[in-house]
Amino acid sequence: QVTLNLSRAVDDSIQEAVLKVTLTLEDKDVYYYTRIEQNFNRSARECLNFAKSIHEKTFDKQYAEELEAYLEPNEESDNTTLQTVNIHSNISHLQWGDLNPQVSTDVDWSIKECNTVYTSLLARYQVTCTGDSGEVETYNVKEFFRVRCNAGQMYLLDYSRTMNQIFNGNK
């Protein structure tokens, strides 16, 4: 593991730059390119805390009214399946319908983009729940949030969640 201290790598007058990392393996060089930006007092922590709060409240029906305020339900969403849920879904689907899943792993949070307008975050985790046949089933879940913080007010700009069942060959 290598840690790069980039605090002084980019002049304050430069807002965005390309970082090139070269890894030399025997006789070959491997290149990795990424974008780095200056962080001028952005609200990534507030956006992450907001997304975590929404994530947790989807598992508790008592927060239905609060969560409903962030949804934009319309015909763009397929409210017949819990496999894909988005900001256009109804509150029942956002809150897992009658599935009653239990988070069975740590939730892995990552910031995908952070700029002056919004922050995009991704949560990855697994849930277990009882399936139609009465057996415990496990699902991989990805939850995407696009959040804006403006003058202390939080806005959910986009949301999507997908879940895919993990195949169990023993059943």
What is each model feature region?
Residues 47, 51, 66-69, 124-140, ...:
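N-terminal secretory signal sequences
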Residues 75-76, 85-88, 116-123, 136-141, ...:
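A broad "ordered helical/assembly scaffold" signature
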Residues 1-19, 89-135:
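Surface-exposed, charged secondary-structure patches
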Residues 8-44, 135-171:
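Short beta-strand edge/turn micro-motifs at domain boundaries
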